Amino acid sequence: MGYYSLTEITAVQYAKDYGYFEEKANVICHEIGDGNLNYVFKLDDGEKSIIIKQALPYAKVVGESWPLSIKRATIESKALQIFAQYVPDYVPVVYSHDEELAITVIEDLSRLTITRKGLIDGEEYPLLSQHIGRFLAHVLFYTSDFGLQSEEKRILEGTFVNPDLCKITEDLVFTDPFGHYDTNDYEPDLQLVVDELWSDKTLKLKVAQYKYKFLTRKETLIHGDLHTGSIFSSPSETKVIDPEFATYGPFGFDIGQFIANLLLNALSREEEKRSVLFFHIEKTWSYFVETFTKLWIGEGVEAYTKEKQWLPIILQNIFTDAVGFAGCELIRRTIGLAHVADLDEIENKETRIQAKKQALSLGKELIKYESKSADIQLFRTLFQQTVSRGVKA
């Protein structure tokens, strides 16, 4: 039959055909996706529920003028299954994958809240940083040369060649926001700040280096899009979703993206409500280091993991990369194609423009920063310096 796009009606029939519901069951189906690339259907018969996710052959945010391979759905399904090998508590269960229709049937997580929405609404997730720190440590370690035999790693790397979505990252994170490109999207009040950013040669040279790292450093399996909209949370649970951008890349990429999105939320808050975001930034790194170190000592398969001086160098390199990648993400989410609600939904225009200017300023500081040590307090320090300088609307 070949590929076809599901509707709410055909999604129900698909689920019945594959035995998820009885043929006579009264199944309620709603398309609930708010992302840029896929359809997401929730199906519920009153007793059980599932999620059907289907990749579209184009970017939904743009339309059919931006074609994409539906093979990314297979990559997403494989990534979730690999994550589940190491951290099953932190990902949804994958029930099945249909490669021809680019459909993945997964656990319904509607008992939880998308973390971005929860943070905007002022919800608190005390275990978020512990869970994400441990998720990152396990996945990044076990799919790298440190936790996986080199021949196995090369084979695994080959299954995550993801050209379409890597090209999106290359363009939308590292290229377009730093020059005159049609994909950029920002308010006219930011034009002077944007012009200054685009003319900053030192900044562009640093961004070029971070882009080159993303292009060439195939160090470990990365989620590739680990922002707070790709995580479900409750006070006791955390689930990472949507790894369709998964590929082999730099250790620091996912860490930097996650931290950047916490910083964006902090910029949207009043000063007295920001401390919880810095708690999560600092704890994410500390749990990552603690867990990664234990795995390195106890599970390392690469010969030089026995050299005590090697681990601190690796952690410093990861931290340095995370800082720069976080800076790129801050700028991309402020003036690039895909914004975040944390900033865009600030109702007061003056406050919103001020927060966006501060995001751009902080992004530049992080990209240019030459870190000499893996001091996680750096994010709090540069944030406070940026805000106190009085970047005004």
Swiss-Prot record:
Give the binding site residues for substrate.
Answer: D225, R332
What sort of enzyme, by top EC class, is this?
transferase
InterPro entries documented for this protein: Aminoglycoside_PTrfase, Kinase-like_dom_sf, Methylthioribose_kinase
**GO terms for biological process, alphabetical:** L-methionine salvage from methylthioadenosine
Which keywords describe this protein according to UniProt? Answer: Amino-acid biosynthesis, ATP-binding, Kinase, Methionine biosynthesis, Nucleotide-binding, Transferase
Q: Give the signal sequence positions.
A: none
Reactions catalysed, semicolon-separated, are: 5-(methylsulfanyl)-D-ribose + ATP = 5-(methylsulfanyl)-alpha-D-ribose 1-phosphate + ADP + H(+)
Enzyme Commission number: 2.7.1.100
Q: Name a Pfam family for this protein.
A: APH
Q: Does the keyword Membrane apply?
A: no
**A molecular-function term among this protein's GO annotations:** ATP binding
Q: Which residues bind ATP?
A: N38, K53, E107, D108, L109, D242, P243, E244
Q: In which pathway does it act?
A: Amino-acid biosynthesis; L-methionine biosynthesis via salvage pathway; S-methyl-5-thio-alpha-D-ribose 1-phosphate from S-methyl-5'-thioadenosine (hydrolase route): step 2/2
Q: Record's family?
A: Belongs to the methylthioribose kinase family.
User: How does the annotation summarize its subunit structure?
Assistant: Homodimer.
HAMAP family, alphabetized: Salvage_MtnK
Question: What is the annotated role of this protein in its UniProt record?
Answer: Catalyzes the phosphorylation of methylthioribose into methylthioribose-1-phosphate.
The name on file for this protein is Methylthioribose kinase
Q: Which organism is it from?
A: Bacillus cereus (strain ATCC 14579 / DSM 31 / CCUG 7414 / JCM 2152 / NBRC 15305 / NCIMB 9373 / NCTC 2599 / NRRL B-3711)
